[in-house]
Amino acid sequence: MNALLAILINITLSLTLISVAFWLPQPNHYTEKASPYECGFDPMSSARLPFSMKFFLIGITFLLFDLEIALLLPIPWAMQYENMHMTTSTAFALITILTLGLAYEWLNKGLEWTE
């Protein structure tokens, strides 16, 4: 009896919501709202549009630091093993290499968005 009552309530609620959705006024559709927008590029135009090399370099730098975080996240679990010296030295080497690379980018003005 409980299963039949639950099914009946679900069907009634579903039909009520569907009928209310049909009776509500439809919103106005503007062409700007209906068009897809992908990261500032028009998807209907040519896909061979050039973009700034600065944008590319900052994107690659972001991906490198994202990868660094992904590589450093399991370090607390790796600290539980007996070879803790190897884990900390590897993590320190990774952070040092990425810090030196960031300093090199910064000194060569690779992170300057406008010149």
UniProtKB/Swiss-Prot annotation:
GO terms for cellular component: mitochondrial inner membrane; NADH dehydrogenase complex. The chain crosses the membrane at residues 4-24, 55-75, 87-107. GO terms for molecular function: NADH dehydrogenase (ubiquinone) activity. The keyword Translocase applies. It comes from the Eukaryota. It is found in: Mitochondrion inner membrane. InterPro entries: NADH_UbQ/plastoQ_OxRdtase_su3, NDAH_ubi_oxred_su3_sf. It catalyses: a ubiquinone + NADH + 5 H(+)(in) = a ubiquinol + NAD(+) + 4 H(+)(out). One of its GO terms (biological process) is mitochondrial electron transport, NADH to ubiquinone. Coiled coil: none annotated. Disulfide bonds: none annotated. It is a multi-pass membrane protein. It is an enzyme of class 7 (translocase). Pfam families: Oxidored_q4. Keywords: Electron transport, Membrane, Mitochondrion, Mitochondrion inner membrane, NAD, Respiratory chain, Translocase, Transmembrane, Transmembrane helix, Transport, Ubiquinone. Core subunit of respiratory chain NADH dehydrogenase (Complex I) which is composed of 45 different subunits. Interacts with TMEM186. Interacts with TMEM242. Belongs to the complex I subunit 3 family. Core subunit of the mitochondrial membrane respiratory chain NADH dehydrogenase (Complex I) which catalyzes electron transfer from NADH through the respiratory chain, using ubiquinone as an electron acceptor. Essential for the catalytic activity of complex I. This is NADH-ubiquinone oxidoreductase chain 3. It comes from Calomys callosus (Large vesper mouse).
